[in-house]
């Protein structure tokens, strides 16, 4: 079943010059297509919409601060089982626990600065795509 998902290449991926490598890995996998790509710096409103469910948790403020620290690359990726697949390609949130061959396993350093965000379900993908690409949903 074809799906769409949101992928964010976080400020650490942009700062470290890894966006091209990560995008190449996504494009090479399973015939997925990148149908939208945008470089942007996230404002407070967008970050609150995206991470609002975590407000009040100890990691919320540092996460929002990190995500506002530099530009991100936002992508819409489409293809068969793309939601599950991109998350597998990214690897676990903690780069130390991520296997070699995954994006975080190969390039990740710490949990908060873990290079990539990918929607975790069809519902999340739909909600997140409306935030980042409102004209494409």
Curated annotation (Swiss-Prot):
Specify the domain of life of the species encoding this protein.
Answer: Bacteria
Question: Is Protein biosynthesis given among the entry's keywords?
Answer: no
Q: Where does ATP bind?
A: 10, 59, 87, 93, 104, 114
| Any one biological process term the GO annotation gives | CTP biosynthetic process
Q: Where is this chain's protein located in or outside the cell?
A: Cytoplasm
Q: Which reaction does it catalyse?
A: a 2'-deoxyribonucleoside 5'-diphosphate + ATP = a 2'-deoxyribonucleoside 5'-triphosphate + ADP; a ribonucleoside 5'-diphosphate + ATP = a ribonucleoside 5'-triphosphate + ADP
Pfam families recorded: NDK (PF00334)
- Enzyme Commission number(s) from the entry: 2.7.4.6
Write down the required cofactor(s).
Mg(2+)
> What is an example of a GO molecular function annotated in this UniProt entry?
nucleoside diphosphate kinase activity
Q: Which UniProt keywords apply?
A: ATP-binding, Cytoplasm, Kinase, Magnesium, Metal-binding, Nucleotide metabolism, Nucleotide-binding, Phosphoprotein, Transferase
Protein family membership:
Belongs to the NDK family.
The identity of this protein, by name, is Nucleoside diphosphate kinase
Species classification: Bacteria, Bacillati, Actinomycetota, Actinomycetes, Kitasatosporales
